[in-house]
Amino acid sequence: MDITGRKLFVKALEEEGVDTIFGYPGGTVTDLFDELYKTDSINLILPRHEQGLIHEAEGYAKSTGRVGVCLVTSGPGATNIITGLADAHYDSIPLVCFTGQVPLGLIGNDAFQEVDIVGMTRSITKYGVTVRRREDLGKIIKMAFYIAQTGKPGPVLIDIPKDIQTASGPAEYPSHVDIRGYKPIHGVHIGQLKKAYKMLKSAKKPLILAGGGVNISHAGEKLKKFMEKENVPVVTTIMGKGAVPTTHPLYIGNCGMHGKYAANMAVMECDLLFSIGTRFNDRITGDLNEFAPHAQIVHIDVDTASISRNVVVDVPVVADAGVALEKLLEWAEKKDTAKWQEQIHRWEKENSLAMRRDRGISPQMIMEHINAQFPHSIYVTDVGQHQMWATQYLELDEQSQLITSGGLGTMGFGFPASIGAKIANPKKPVVCITGDGGFQMNIQEMATAVTQGTGITICLLNNNYLGMVRQMQELFYGKRYSATCLRRRPSCPGGCKGPNDQCPEYVPDFVKLAESYGAYGIRVEKEEDIDAAFAEAKKHTDAPTIIEFMIATDELVLPMVKSGNPMSEMILK
């Protein structure tokens, strides 16, 4: 049966079970949008900018475990999703992104809105291709969905020239494809895993390090059972937070640059680091020569390229976290770690996350109230100080989830990602935790949130600064606050120490801004008003509510380890 490329495109999405697509139209994809108009099975979301669009798809994918799907036009439409592709690449988020392209005969002629988007994104996609023959379209789309969600998940880009969309001929959407050279890991090498487990049994001070791979493979329950059976304490990376309940007695906390004192000390003093689903990012290791100096290291990861790339390990195991843990559970036996846990409890008495209550609203207070008022929720953060406070203080269990930008650290990620998460989970509370800097990077998505009727609670921590950079300037750059004050004007004196009486009070006024979009806005300056603001936000299920928390400009995220230093060198006060 003859079928056009545009019809095959929509049929492919339906066959893959796609129920939502985030798309922004343009000249080279008008045919595809016209075909989407005719189907009732796919919800087409119109964002206000392509970067917002791809972050919304990330939020959708992270909150569901399904593939996020994007559709944008050629040229600037395509280049605007590059940051999101990189973000998804580093955080292993399954996306299939379709870009329009000029007709085949114009490729290479510098045609209007022609860019080589496949070439531009080759290093940040699992697979990228320009469709050259209409009869290949179905096979390529099938490959894209398979590649995006198998092995180490990630983004795939399919570039579809305009004439491929309109060409007609015989074609079917395949039920499966064989991809030469692509062999994702499904099993586990039992011999290597037994070596790793034998090492665990002989250790006196074992420690499990759980990364984002545990969450990606939905292996949190298996990890919880394993650590309980073995009686071994656990630390997590930021991306691994939530893999086990944060209130569990064997859970110590996040480790790394802004990790908990006890968690970092446990890494530094353990004699076996049993790592699962982490790539040993520099924010976790600090000085590689001083990382886990007394430990033998086991590394279980589905990505062969991650093994021994940053940290040379003693026992490598290439496997999905869930598959490895399932086998480990068959062997698990309780071991005596009482003395080791006593040492950890002594470190925990340092109370490196102590809360300040001596000067207005502290960020820690806000997180405490979020825990009380929004349990069992999806928490989405942007990037900056607020992100670290959230990862330090939010309590997570099996019914809650933390979504954040870890590998790329993308400011502007949080708000659109929360929209995508809410669209995917309309009945679940979604709390966006953001700052006055990051929120303004994709503030136009307020229109998307309002038109989609997403009742998101936006906790905006406003310190009038790019707070994380300001913190580095305070601690390491002699308090020279260069280009970090968000209220600074040309008339401000050189060497300005921060907002003063001559500065405009609000830039912008987030309450009025919310109202101008048809959303809700509340400003909170006292702790006693926090719960009332949350109660008001819960009433608004038809549109987002911005709760602007006015916090001190000089709040610091502590502990902190200077980049490149050993994780034992924590700044605590």
What are these regions (language model features)?
Residues 1-332, 369, 378, 455-458, ...:
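N-terminal alpha/beta PP-like core and its mobile active-site loop of ThDP/TPP-dependent enzymes
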Residues 124-127, 178-179, 345-359, 495-496:
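Short glycine/proline- and acidic residue-enriched helix-loop micro-motifs
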Residues 29, 50-55, 386-388, 526-530:
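Short acidic loop-to-helix transition motifs that present clustered carboxylates
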Residues 159, 380-382, 548:
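Short beta-strand segments
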Residues 6-9, 14, 19, 32-36, ...:
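Active-site diphosphate/adenylate-binding microenvironment
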